[in-house]
Amino acid sequence: HKEYRRQRQMCIRDSTNNDYGKGLADVYVAAVKAHGISVTTVTAHEEGKGDYGAEVATLASAGGDALAVLGYLDQAGGSIIEGSLDSGSFDTFVLSDGMIGDSLTDRFGKDLNKSFGSLPGSTGKGAGKFAEVAKAGGIDSSGPYTGESYDAAALITLAMQAGGKGDRATIQANVMDVANAPGKKIYPGAVS
């Protein structure tokens, strides 16, 4: 994203104070540094607090052109954005997938015009085929994990076909065989 490349310094406010949040923050730090952007601080937060003013003040004192908020939209992440906007600490936010949703723009509107985020997914042949199949079925394929959910359902279906039954044990016994080589690539829309 072009805005990402314009940043010189970035604060990273990681997801909840747990192993997932730490791992996600580590990935973001590596990506930011790979683009020549310095990281001014990386801090974790606890979910469920009523006020994140102290956390926002800590982030503001570290400085930066943008604040990466790697949290959950309707929990602490949204409150940290709100506190940052209210205090004038940051006006550009880099958002992880857990921070992206309609309630974000409903809550902050144009205040997020400089902000951007990332969603998991791929851009290969399978992604294009899935977008076509989803559109034909009236499904919005742009949401997080939509394509991956389709893939998971297809693997479960193929594992049941391979084992001849639809029970848990059959799926477990066959899923790795249908998901890995040798085999035939099956693209979205071809599972029946």
At which residue positions do the language-model features occur?
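Extracytosolic ligand-binding ectodomains
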Residues: 5-9, 13-192
